[in-house]
């Protein structure tokens, strides 16, 4: 395991929310005492938990495909990868509102393309969400030439996809590249030769869980 993963423990996307509610809480406590302020302290703790972004040890196996998100496996199937135009193995992770919302690179690789698609906001737990919902796809090329596509998909509640990478950049496994507020779904498209290491219904953790292995 590689434990080098510099980043804030609280996702930067949550700093404005946390700062705002913390200031309001202090004002209420100063003006009216703890009896009135305790609900605001509870809300502050909820926001703190909601935007947590804990460090993750990165597995060092060269051929491991790491989970890009915390959540539950909802699909392991052979489909067409519409972003890299190839047949592929798709593994999908559904993220609920209580999961960590950061998205991380599943492999080391160079970003070949970043594609944004407007769309619907149906329940991300449904298969049709993969191609009908608003989404953002990045295609990564490993050093051996194999392609891995990671797609952030919006959902019924999650309507804010953030992606911080662009074509030409190099990502390392476990590197934070995006964020989906209020959870949702991430689809990973792999070469057909990839061997899945997870099953439908299994809970996974971003970076820590190996989704599949490449030949």
UniProtKB/Swiss-Prot annotation:
Co-factor binding details: Binds 1 pyruvoyl group covalently per subunit.
Annotated site residue numbers, Cleavage (non-hydrolytic): 183-184
GO cellular component terms, semicolon-separated: plasma membrane
Domain of life: Bacteria
GO molecular function: phosphatidylserine decarboxylase activity
One Pfam family matching this protein: PS_Dcarbxylase
Catalytic activity: a 1,2-diacyl-sn-glycero-3-phospho-L-serine + H(+) = a 1,2-diacyl-sn-glycero-3-phosphoethanolamine + CO2
InterPro entries in the record: PS_Dcarbxylase (IPR003817), PSD-A (IPR033175)
Enzyme Commission (EC) number: 4.1.1.65
Cofactor(s) recorded in Swiss-Prot or TrEMBL: pyruvate
Membrane topology: Peripheral membrane protein
Annotated compartments: Cell membrane
Alphabetic keyword roster: Cell membrane, Decarboxylase, Lipid biosynthesis, Lipid metabolism, Lyase, Membrane, Phospholipid biosynthesis, Phospholipid metabolism, Pyruvate, Zymogen
Annotated family: Belongs to the phosphatidylserine decarboxylase family. PSD-A subfamily.
Subunit structure: Heterodimer of a large membrane-associated beta subunit and a small pyruvoyl-containing alpha subunit.
PANTHER family hit by this protein: ARCHAETIDYLSERINE DECARBOXYLASE PROENZYME-RELATED
Protein's job: Catalyzes the formation of phosphatidylethanolamine (PtdEtn) from phosphatidylserine (PtdSer).
Protein name: Phosphatidylserine decarboxylase proenzyme
Protein's organism: Ralstonia pickettii (strain 12J)
Classification lineage: Bacteria, Pseudomonadati, Pseudomonadota, Betaproteobacteria, Burkholderiales
Name of the gene: psd
């Amino acid at each position: 395991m590689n434990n080098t993963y510099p980043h804030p423990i609280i996702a930067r996307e949550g700093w404005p929310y946390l700062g705002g509610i913390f200031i309001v809480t202090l004002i209420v406590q100063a003006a009216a005492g703890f009896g009135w302020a305790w609900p605001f302290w509870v809300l502050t703790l909820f926001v703190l938990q909601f935007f947590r972004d804990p460090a993750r040890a990165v597995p060092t196996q060269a051929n491991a495909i790491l989970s890009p998100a915390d959540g539950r496996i909802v699909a392991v199937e052979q489909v067409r990868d519409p972003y890299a135009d190839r047949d592929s193995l798709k593994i999908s992770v559904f993220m609920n509102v209580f999961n960590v919302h950061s998205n991380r690179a599943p492999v080391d690789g160079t970003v070949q393309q970043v594609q944004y698609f407007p769309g619907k906001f149906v329940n991300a737990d449904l298969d049709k969400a993969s191609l009908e919902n608003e989404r953002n796809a990045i295609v990564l090329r490993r050093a051996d030439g194999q392609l891995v596509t990671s797609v952030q998909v919006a959902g019924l509640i999650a309507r804010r996809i953030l992606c911080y990478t662009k074509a030409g950049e190099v990502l390392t496994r476990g590197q934070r590249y995006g964020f989906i507020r209020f959870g949702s779904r991430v689809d990973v498209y792999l070469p057909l030769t990839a061997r899945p290491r997870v099953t439908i219904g299994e809970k996974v953790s971003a970076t820590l869980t190996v989704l599949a292995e490449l030949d």
